[in-house]
Amino acid sequence: MQPRDLSHHVAYEAGRGIEEVARELGLDPDDLVKLSSNENPFGPSPKAAEAIREHADRVNSYPKAAATDLRGEIGDLLSVDAAQVWLGNGGDGALDYLARAMLDPDDGVLVPDPGFAYYGMSARYHHGQVNSYPIEKDDDFEQSPDAILESYDGERIVYLTSPHNPTGSEVSLSDVEAVAEGTDEETLVVVDEAYGEFADSPSAVALVEERDDVAVLRTFSKAYGLAGVRLGYAVVPGEWADAYARVNTPFAASEIACRAGLAALEDDAHVEKTVETARWAREYIRSTLECRTYESAGNFVLCAVGDGGEVAEAAQKEGVIVRDTTSFGLPSCIRITCGTREETKRAVEVVNDLL
């Protein structure tokens, strides 16, 4: 017996972890700086950590009340109805729910290239077809409606990323609307705002209330520092929000995750410190690194270093883990996550010595 044909599927390549690198190189994990996965350098919100401890003895219960409360709090924060908030096991889970709601077998999706691999992975899991639109280095990775619509061929879902991973470029609200206007009535435009807290531009949630063909993806993994508990959500138009009950995995957002999310939403100071430090680090990297860098609205900077794999491997041996972006189709670049001031300065010093 064998599984079905998975030849068109790909494995997700995540940034390397501290423990993995430490074992490989025989180093003390405490001596390593990990700036490869766009994680929060300050850890989770202290309020979220306390909530996890406080509710640890309640994980024998399914998270019905906690999930309901969290959907309500997110709805209040974004000025949408709680029913429009689709909680998932990370942003990936919310992407899966959107695919389940939208895709029949062989329906197409349009994804950015380079871009987040899970858009295509999720579509293929749901028997969809994956097409791409180019984001060109020569255009500073601009995500222009013209280029997107030129590649569009009636796909059921079009994915936009703002800020874009791994380049940091943004899509304006007017450009999101232009894409939505230029696609068919039955095409959903999904705006992935996983890094939205780090950007100055307004959220596309404003368009969700105006249209029935735009949805927004958000996560607690980045600015809130909760990557390990896996919590994200989609905000969908009210006209079809009730589809959630028919496509979600029951209780996929765990009791601990929901309680941590509720507490994190109350910790403005933690988010503000995280965002302020990321903005400082972006500017420091761009002004101090001795190679071309690209303007970023996320908590990371894409850097053209010549041979990304070689530089990333050498930096690792010096105790700094950065992301080789070869898996994104950018072998000449690395991506540096915005760390604390000390971590960021160390990373820039190490990379400069390698250039």
From Swiss-Prot:
It holds the Pfam family Aminotran_1_2. Pathway: Amino-acid biosynthesis; L-histidine biosynthesis; L-histidine from 5-phospho-alpha-D-ribose 1-diphosphate: step 7/9. It comes from the Archaea. Its cofactor is pyridoxal 5'-phosphate. It catalyses: L-histidinol phosphate + 2-oxoglutarate = 3-(imidazol-4-yl)-2-oxopropyl phosphate + L-glutamate. The modification N6-(pyridoxal phosphate)lysine is found at residue 222. PROSITE patterns: AA_TRANSFER_CLASS_2. Keywords: Amino-acid biosynthesis, Aminotransferase, Histidine biosynthesis, Pyridoxal phosphate, Transferase. One of its GO terms (biological process) is L-histidine biosynthetic process. Its EC number is 2.6.1.9. Belongs to the class-II pyridoxal-phosphate-dependent aminotransferase family. Histidinol-phosphate aminotransferase subfamily. HAMAP family: HisC_aminotrans_2. This is Histidinol-phosphate aminotransferase. It comes from Natronomonas pharaonis (strain ATCC 35678 / DSM 2160 / CIP 103997 / JCM 8858 / NBRC 14720 / NCIMB 2260 / Gabara). The lineage of its organism: Archaea, Methanobacteriati, Methanobacteriota, Stenosarchaea group, Halobacteria.
